[in-house]
């Protein structure tokens, strides 16, 4: 028997003809898909993808009506899986949430047990959603670079889109771990905040989006790119030999205009960060680190 009330409030996006109607309304429990864990949602973060899910031209939503929200955190109120007891604090993000399955902008949610992450001690639901999908992706990027051998002594690391959620969190994590981090941003008024997060230097948008040679001077020991096609060509042609960039964004465009030379002459690596489908075991391990050494 469900512990979710027969009706509850949720933000709903409903496609009608060529437009999307959205607003907070009563939603019926029977409209939620099946799942082993029922959660009283306490917090959800707002992501770029959530905005796209509420637009007629967003190309994100796969069902209509849809409760957006690609992440959520809250309290277990019922569970068919012994790993999750009533009253436990948990989170879920990625997979199909807020895309082809109702998401976190709701008072209640029902999800598969295989998507649920127990919150580590010391990390509240609010803390978890302050980090959110963006912070998780940032941590995933830093870990991917370090798993390839990146260390603070190797030299400067570039973060593009540093004013955004992924970029800003990556900047803070890297700086806290002792790296010399340079922040690229299109918002000059953000320099003070980026310096406070730990940026050793600032690059303007023009410096990282202009055309260049197939290979430019080697500069970066590693990079986190949260923008996409607008900045990634610059990053690739300025990475040092053997360096890597962890890429997760497409707000600056999806079509990548580059050459093979960074790959075949300098051996650089382009690491794709897929936080949506990351296996649950690794996902849980990374959230444990976000409560400890990556916090």
Each predicted region: which residue ranges?
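Glycine-rich beta-strand-centered segment in the early N-terminal region that forms part
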Residues: 30-46, 56-97
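NAD(P)H dinucleotide-binding glycine-rich loop of Rossmann-like/cofactor-binding domains
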Residues: 93-158
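Adenosine-nucleotide cofactor-binding segment
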Residues: 175-231, 288
